[in-house]
Amino acid sequence: MKTFMAKSHVIKKTWYIIDAKHKILGRLSTVISRYLIGKHKIEYAPHVDIGDYVIVLNAKEVSVSGHKRDDKIYYHHTGYIGGIKQLNFKRMINRYPEKVIEIAVKGMLPKGPLGRMMYCRLRVYSGNVHAHAAQEPQFIDIDC
């Protein structure tokens, strides 16, 4: 009997919804990345893109533990000399609540073309309204 090898065009991708309200950022991000990579499926293979789509709601209400609300700093560079900018978590969650979860999840995905394809299946919304009702997403309840 031959070994089954998963192919990305054969595997059906499903849509999942995760509510981020009062969830810890790191623990939430590990669950999201697990579904994007496809490790929850029995057909998982590290060289094949078989992960699912993930919709994250209420990104504005995600929490962090300890003093990270004030101490965690996000850096970016404008491209100009001396153009390094920084925002702490509190300001970042007020200005760009979706980016906080996107940055955390992107760091947990594989680097390279396969990881970029996985990252494209992540949808993050600051409120509890999304535009993906036609895909009939399944709700995932996580404890973290």
Curated annotation (Swiss-Prot):
Belongs to the universal ribosomal protein uL13 family. One of its GO terms (molecular function) is mRNA binding. Signal peptide: none annotated. PROSITE patterns: RIBOSOMAL_L13. This protein is one of the early assembly proteins of the 50S ribosomal subunit, although it is not seen to bind rRNA by itself. It is important during the early stages of 50S assembly. Part of the 50S ribosomal subunit. GO terms for biological process: negative regulation of translation; translation. Keywords: Ribonucleoprotein, Ribosomal protein. It holds the Pfam family Ribosomal_L13. One of its GO terms (cellular component) is cytosolic large ribosomal subunit. The keyword Ribosomal protein applies. InterPro entries: Ribosomal_uL13, Ribosomal_uL13_bac-type, Ribosomal_uL13_CS, Ribosomal_uL13_sf. It comes from the Bacteria. This is Large ribosomal subunit protein uL13.
